[in-house]
C-alpha cells in the first residue's frame, strides 16, 4: 500500500477488516489494490460504505450501489449517505443477501461508458430471481458519480435519480436496441433474451414481460412463450 490513498473497509459492526488502496501517481502500477482475503475480510460479503450509511439505509430502505470507493465518499459528502460499493469485485449473490437485510430497493448507478453499461447489464440480471426492487441509472457519457456531483451538484444528481429505469426494462431495452428490426436481428435478440426470461421466477411478471417483448418485436406471444418454456426445460 506504499504511495497509495487508503480506504478503510468496515464490517456492519464498524470493525476495520481490510483496506482498499488507490495509487497516487499513476504509472505501471495497478490502479487499485485490496487487502488479501482473510476469515474476517471476504470481498464477496462486504460492501464499502454500508456501515457508515446504515442509519440512512434503514430509514429509507434504499441503497445506491456505485462502482468505487471515491464515488461512495463523494455521494456521502453531498448527502446521499445510502451509497455503497463492492470492494474491487462484481456484485455477488452474497452481496444481495446482505442488502436484503437492510433495504428493499437498490439503485444501480454506473459510469457513462461502455464498461458501465456492461456492468449495469451484468449486475442487473443478478437481481431478477430476487424479491428486491432494483433499477438502473446511467450517467452521461464520460461521467462517473464523483465527477458528476463535482460538476453539477446535488440537485442535478437528484434529478438524475428520478430517471431511474426498472432493471428488467433496462435489460430489455438494451438488448432490443442492439439488433436491427429484421428476422435475423429478432432471432439474435431472442437468443440473448432467453436467459433473462429464465431468471424471472415470478410467473405473472414473466408473462407480462413476454407480452411486452412480443409486442415490441411484432411476434405472437405464443411464439415467445413456447421458446421460453423450451429454454427452461433445457436449462438455458
Regions found by a protein language model. Give the residues of each.
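ATP/adenylate-binding site constellation spanning eukaryotic-like Ser/Thr protein kinases
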Residues: 80, 142, 233
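Phosphate-handling DNA/RNA-contact segment within nucleic-acid enzymes
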Residues: 1-102, 106, 119-120
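Short, glycine/serine-rich, charged loops/turns that create anion-binding
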Residues: 23-24, 113, 235
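Single conserved hydrophobic/aromatic residue that forms the stacking wall/gate
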Residues: 226-236
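A charged alpha-helical hairpin associated with nucleic-acid processing machineries
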Residues: 11-12, 54-63, 90-106, 110-228
Amino acid at each position: 500500500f506504499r504511495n497509495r490513498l487508503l480506504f478503510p473497509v468496515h464490517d456492519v459492526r464498524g470493525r476495520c477488516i481490510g483496506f482498499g488502496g488507490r495509487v497516487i501517481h499513476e504509472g505501471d502500477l495497478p490502479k487499485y489494490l485490496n487487502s488479501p482475503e482473510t476469515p474476517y475480510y471476504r470481498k464477496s460479503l462486504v460492501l464499502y460504505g454500508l456501515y457508515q450509511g446504515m442509519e440512512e439505509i434503514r430509514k429509507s430502505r434504499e441503497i445506491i450501489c456505485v462502482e468505487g470507493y471515491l464515488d461512495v465518499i463523494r455521494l456521502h459528502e453531498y448527502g446521499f449517505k445510502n451509497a455503497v460499493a463492492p470492494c474491487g469485485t462484481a456484485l455477488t449473490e452474497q452481496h444481495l443477501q446482505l442488502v436484503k437485510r437492510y433495504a428493499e430497493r437498490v439503485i444501480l448507478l454506473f459510469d457513462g461508458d461502455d464498461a458501465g453499461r456492461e456492468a449495469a447489464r451484468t449486475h442487473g440480471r443478478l437481481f431478477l430471481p430476487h424479491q428486491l426492487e432494483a433499477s438502473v441509472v446511467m450517467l452521461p457519457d464520460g461521467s462517473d458519480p464523483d465527477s458528476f456531483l463535482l460538476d453539477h451538484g446535488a440537485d442535478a444528481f437528484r434529478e438524475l435519480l428520478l430517471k431511474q429505469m426498472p432493471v428488467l426494462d433496462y435489460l430489455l431495452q438494451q438488448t432490443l436496441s442492439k439488433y436491427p428490426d429484421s428476422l435475423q436481428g429478432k432471432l439474435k435478440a431472442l437468443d440473448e433474451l432467453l436467459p433473462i426470461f429464465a431468471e424471472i421466477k415470478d410467473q405473472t411478471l414473466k408473462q407480462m414481460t413476454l407480452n411486452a417483448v412480443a409486442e415490441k418485436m411484432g411476434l405472437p406471444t405464443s411464439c415467445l412463450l413456447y421458446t421460453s418454456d423450451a429454454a427452461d426445460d433445457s436449462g438455458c
